[in-house]
């Protein structure tokens, strides 16, 4: 290589050193100093890994003093270059800048600059970059973007609600599905969509204290959303880091009690500028016109400051219209301001629901019924539609569906309230109860008597809670030596049951963690039964491992022993046998226990086994749950209401189970109340609301589309390619699972989302649902999204050289593959990616500027090419630099037309879609007051900003590949 003192060179292997200067030479070696980093490098004169930096007319360079020069002419004198041109800060012409005076902190960011500077990437990195651009652009444009990445079954009614609400501006809705239909999952899907699209960035979730960990686990395991749990301790710690502790995290979970207890804390929460507020168990927010509770007022303050709200409740509105109104009032206080007016409105919607029932029944409508429909949709001429709907002609069904759709748009609360019931959603198993009455051991009888004497001052409720768990009473007196499991007949029964059903998975739930741990030891030591334990003292990772062991078919645990709190948020549909070793105190917890198995997707009927001790609080509770509420074999929406009504009487029987006087009457009363309330619920079922919430065929089609996308293998090949290039080790674990671990030679030291000790992944939804230790990889998973960002935000793969062996073309023929990106810059919340994500446009130009891209498909062409090492590549580039410059100029001329077409198409689509949505809502505003003014204003503002941003869209060269034809 011809070196001269003062020449500027760049290192091929350490480009971060910047621009180097030749400072010493001898016969064999050259010393190059890199002023930007203060380092020297000694290279062999022959074959050193450095490239001469030479700029061309049209380039802009920076001097060491900071001013810039637009080059018009380049002269070489004694091996050194001098650039002449116009100085950009003063517009002075004919300014000369010698190469030794160039800024040393030079970074080559443009693909063509990197190519000419010898910074040539591996060929496979170029291919990965193009694929990453292509896939990322396609994913953003998918209509179900944000709905595929969660570790959940594809259940139509959940997808329908999430798809509807998740795309709204600052949604304010009440999710009121019955127990077991997945409100938490619906809320998670909505959050996931809003966060992924940029519509929301800061989220606050407020839940009862006992559900904090359930939400933490669900959000992380199902949606890869890493929330922070704020309690008194975390709040105090965060006060050292910020004036407002809640501004230290973007995603926060805290308890309702935590929010209510401190005025200062509530002020900090209100000032923290959340985008979305989620409140679970919203029926606990007690309200009356004259005396709202402190909890309600706290959430009301937050609701006034936070644009988007999701309220979750399982309590049907028929069991408390006033509290139902209170929840709607939180969503839109202007719309729901007067309870009496609300009651009257609800009664007026009855004809709407009846009309829908008539249409769906498919019967011919009477004149009165036709008149009712005309009155309900009075602002439009629907006579032709009614005529078709009431005929036997083709199109009658379609006409009926259109009328139902029109009625739904006019329905009172269908935009703010979603409610699915088990009657309206198919796919649930039956529940069969097996009670096992067992004798009360004398040891327990003695312990209970002594406890009664010593605990005489305890309240009836405390005594009742004690009496449910006699093993706890016994251990209080006997201490750690109290081996209750040696004589408790429930333990003998459990061991017998498990040994008789060795091949079947059994979930055992008990109230206390200590009971679960002791049972595991007994089962292991006495019968060699493999049992996993699951309790609140374990970390999330430990619980994952226990759940995964239970989920393994052949070598896994036969039994999972759960404590009450430990099992929250976990579902085990692959098991269908449930043993309740003891009973919970209230119907909600009972339903929660059964709900671990009784989910949509459960393939078998659920066998519920309840071994109980006679003449104890357990025997009282078994009868009350089963005979009074029918709560074991059916979901019990009436349970909490009846429990609140008979609470004190029930507590009395539980505290003194030997006193059975009047208990039969209590059970009879409860059953009558239960049956009456069920009839009331059934009669009050809002069929229209259920149809709207369920989504029907539209929801089914959405689920099928996502399922089809799940089967697409392009993600797997892309992910494997990505992991290879980033330097992540992959170890096939079998059962469609792969273990990823960091290597010593990664593209970046810490790959975001990959733990130090690695992780297990799967691309199969079914595997992810049964194996909680395996992460479910989709295009929306952080590992893939972070990988895409890593490749595309830097210059990885932006310039490369390949050889094409093709004897049909002359040796030395040049082709230049150019990847342009058309994009628009805008705030994330505008969700511009729906219309114009960063979109790659590929040109394949020959020396004459002919674009061959349409004839030469990328993947098949890529397979015909071979790589060139960096040193040879640099020599090739230097030899053909002038030709490459000429082809690049032709590329710039050709891209404008293609880019303009893309931008114009995106602008038309955005204008049509956003204008249509605005027009639809404005038309409905006249007949449905649940459409908020601020929502309409936001859509119009959004439309204007989107169109302005698209007008500013531009394009740039993102990557290029120089291809040279060879015959060898």
Swiss-Prot record:
Looking up SUPFAM superfamilies in the UniProt record yields:
P-loop containing nucleoside triphosphate hydrolases
Tell me which HAMAP family the record gives: Helicase_RapA
Query: A GO term (biological process) for this protein?
Result: regulation of DNA-templated transcription
| One GO MF term | ATP binding
**Protein known as:** RNA polymerase-associated protein RapA
Q: What does this protein do?
A: Transcription regulator that activates transcription by stimulating RNA polymerase (RNAP) recycling in case of stress conditions such as supercoiled DNA or high salt concentrations. Probably acts by releasing the RNAP, when it is trapped or immobilized on tightly supercoiled DNA. Does not activate transcription on linear DNA. Probably not involved in DNA repair.
List residues of the Helicase ATP-binding domain: 164-334
Give the Gene3D superfamilies listed for this entry. 2.30.30.140, 2.30.30.930, 3.30.360.80, 6.10.140.1500, 6.10.140.2230, P-loop containing nucleotide triphosphate hydrolases, Tandem AAA-ATPase domain
- Pfam families documented for this protein: Helicase_C, RapA_C, SNF2-rel_dom, Tudor_1_RapA, Tudor_RapA
**Quick check: keyword Nucleotide-binding in the entry?**
yes
Where is the motif named DEAH box mapped on this chain? 280-283
- Assembly and interaction partners: Interacts with the RNAP. Has a higher affinity for the core RNAP than for the holoenzyme. Its ATPase activity is stimulated by binding to RNAP.
Enzyme Commission number(s) of this protein = 3.6.4.-
- Give me the disulphide-bonded residues: none
Q: What class of enzyme is it?
A: hydrolase
- What InterPro entries does this protein's entry cite? Helicase_ATP-bd, Helicase_C-like, Helicase_RapA, P-loop_NTPase, RapA_C, SNF2-like_sf, SNF2/RAD54-like_C, SNF2_N
Q: Which UniProt keywords apply?
A: Activator, ATP-binding, DNA-binding, Helicase, Hydrolase, Nucleotide-binding, Transcription, Transcription regulation
Give the record's family classification. Answer: Belongs to the SNF2/RAD54 helicase family. RapA subfamily.
- For ATP, which residues are the binding ones? 177-184
Q: Which residues form the Helicase C-terminal domain?
A: 490-644
């Amino acid at each position: 290589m011809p070196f001269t003192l003062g020449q500027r060179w760049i290192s091929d292997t350490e480009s971060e050193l910047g621009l180097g200067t030749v400072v010493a030479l001898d016969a064999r070696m050259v010393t190059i100093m890199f002023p930007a980093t203060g380092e020297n490098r000694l290279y062999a004169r022959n074959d050193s890994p450095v490239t001469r930096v030479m700029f061309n007319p049209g380039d802009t360079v920076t001097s060491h003093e900071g001013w810039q020069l637009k080059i018009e002419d380049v002269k070489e004198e004694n091996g050194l270059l001098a650039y002449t041109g116009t100085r950009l800060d003063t517009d002075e012409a004919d300014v000369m800048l010698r190469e030794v005076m160039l800024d040393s902190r030079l970074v080559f960011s443009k693909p063509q600059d990197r190519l000419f500077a010898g910074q040539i990437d591996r060929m496979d990195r170029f291919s990965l970059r193009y694929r990453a651009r292509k896939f990322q652009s396609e994913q953003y444009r998918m209509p179900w973007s944000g709905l595929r990445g969660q570790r959940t079954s594809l259940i139509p009614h959940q997808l329908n609600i999430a798809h509807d609400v998740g795309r709204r501006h600052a949604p304010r809705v009440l999710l009121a599905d019955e127990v077991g239909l997945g409100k938490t999952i619906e809320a998670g899907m909505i959050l996931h969509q809003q966060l992924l699209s940029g519509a929301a960035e800061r989220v606050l979730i407020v839940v009862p204290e006992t559900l904090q960990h359930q939400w933490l686990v669900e959000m992380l395991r199902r949606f890869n959303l890493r929330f922070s749990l704020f309690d008194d301790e975390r709040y105090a710690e965060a006060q050292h880091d910020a004036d407002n502790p809640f501004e230290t995290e973007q995603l926060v979970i805290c308890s309702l009690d935590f929010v209510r207890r401190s005025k200062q804390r509530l002020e900090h929460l209100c000032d923290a500028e959340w985008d979305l507020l989620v409140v679970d168990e919203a029926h606990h927010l007690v309200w009356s016109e004259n005396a709202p509770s402190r909890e309600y007022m706290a959430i009301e303050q937050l609701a006034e400051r936070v644009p988007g709200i999701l309220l979750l409740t399982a309590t049907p509105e028929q069991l408390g219209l006033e509290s139902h109104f209170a929840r709607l009032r939180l969503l839109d206080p202007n719309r729901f301001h007067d309870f009496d007016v609300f009651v009257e409105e609800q009664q007026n919607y009855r004809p709407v629901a009846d009309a829908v029932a008539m249409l769906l029944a498919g019967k011919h409508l009477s004149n009165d019924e036709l008149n009712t429909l005309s009155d309900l949709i009075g602002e439009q001429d629907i006579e032709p539609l009614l005529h078709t709907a009431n005929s036997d002609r083709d199109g009658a069904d379609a006409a009926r569906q259109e009328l139902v759709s029109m009625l739904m748009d006019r329905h009172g609360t269908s935009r703010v309230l979603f409610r699915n019931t088990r009657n309206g959603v198919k796919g649930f198993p039956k529940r069969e109860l097996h009670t096992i009455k067992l004798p009360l051991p004398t040891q327990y009888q003695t312990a209970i008597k002594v406890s009664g004497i010593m605990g005489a001052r305890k309240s009836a409720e405390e005594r009742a809670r004690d009496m449910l768990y006699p093993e706890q009473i016994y251990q209080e007196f006997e201490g750690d030596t109290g081996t209750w499991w040696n004589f408790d007949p429930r333990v003998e029964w459990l061991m017998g049951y498990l040994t008789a059903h060795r091949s079947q998975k059994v979930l055992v739930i008990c109230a206390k963690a200590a009971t679960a741990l002791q049972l595991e030891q007994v089962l292991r030591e006495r019968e060699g039964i493999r049992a996993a334990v699951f309790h609140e003292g374990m970390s999330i990772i430990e619980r994952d491992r226990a759940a995964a062991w239970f989920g393994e078919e052949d070598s896994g645990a036969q039994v999972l022993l759960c404590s009450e709190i430990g099992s929250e948020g976990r579902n085990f549909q692959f098991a269908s046998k449930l043993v309740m070793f003891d009973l919970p105190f209230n119907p909600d917890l009972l339903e929660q226990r059964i709900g671990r198995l009784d989910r949509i997707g459960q393939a078998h009927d659920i066998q519920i086994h309840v071994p109980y001790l006679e003449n104890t609080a357990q025997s009282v509770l078994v009868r009350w749950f089963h005979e009074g509420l029918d709560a074991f074999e059916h979901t019990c929406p009436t349970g909490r209401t009846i429990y609140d009504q008979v609470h004190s009487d029930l507590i009395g029987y539980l505290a003194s189970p030997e006193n059975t006087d009047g208990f039969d009457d209590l059970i009879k009363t409860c059953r009558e109340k239960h049956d009456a309330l069920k009839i009331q619920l059934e009669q009050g079922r809002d069929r229209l609301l259920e149809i709207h919430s369920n989504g029907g065929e539209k929801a089914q089609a959405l689920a099928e589309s996502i399922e089809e996308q799940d089967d697409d293998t392009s993600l797997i090949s892309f992910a494997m390619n990505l992991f290879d290039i980033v330097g992540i080790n992959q170890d096939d674990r079998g059962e469609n699972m792969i273990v990823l671990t960091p290597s010593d030679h990664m593209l970046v030291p810490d790959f975001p989302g990959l733990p130090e000790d690695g992780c297990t992944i799967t691309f199969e939804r079914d595997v992810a649902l049964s194996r909680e230790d395996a992460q479910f990889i989709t295009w929306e998973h952080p590992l893939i999204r972070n990988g895409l960002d890593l490749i595309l935000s830097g210059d990885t793969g932006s310039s490369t050289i390949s050889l094409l062996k093709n004897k049909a073309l002359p040796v030395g023929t040049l082709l230049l593959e150019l990847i342009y990106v058309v994009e628009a810059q805008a705030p994330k919340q505008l969700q511009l990616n729906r219309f114009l994500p960063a979109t790659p446009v590929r040109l394949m130009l020959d020396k004459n500027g002919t674009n061959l891209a349409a004839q030469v498909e990328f993947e098949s062409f890529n397979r015909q090419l071979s790589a060139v090492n960096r040193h040879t590549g640099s020599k090739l580039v230097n030899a053909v630099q002038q030709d490459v410059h000429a082809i690049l100029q032709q590329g710039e001329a050709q891209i404008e037309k293609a880019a303009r077409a893309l931008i114009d198409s995106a602008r038309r689509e955005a204008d049509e879609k956003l204008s249509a949505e605005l027009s639809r809502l404005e038309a409905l505003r006249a007949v449905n007051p649940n459409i908020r003014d601020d929502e309409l204003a936001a859509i119009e503002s959004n439309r204007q900003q989107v169109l302005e941003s698209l007008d500013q869209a531009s394009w740039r060269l993102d990557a290029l590949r120089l291809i040279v034809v060879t015959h060898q």
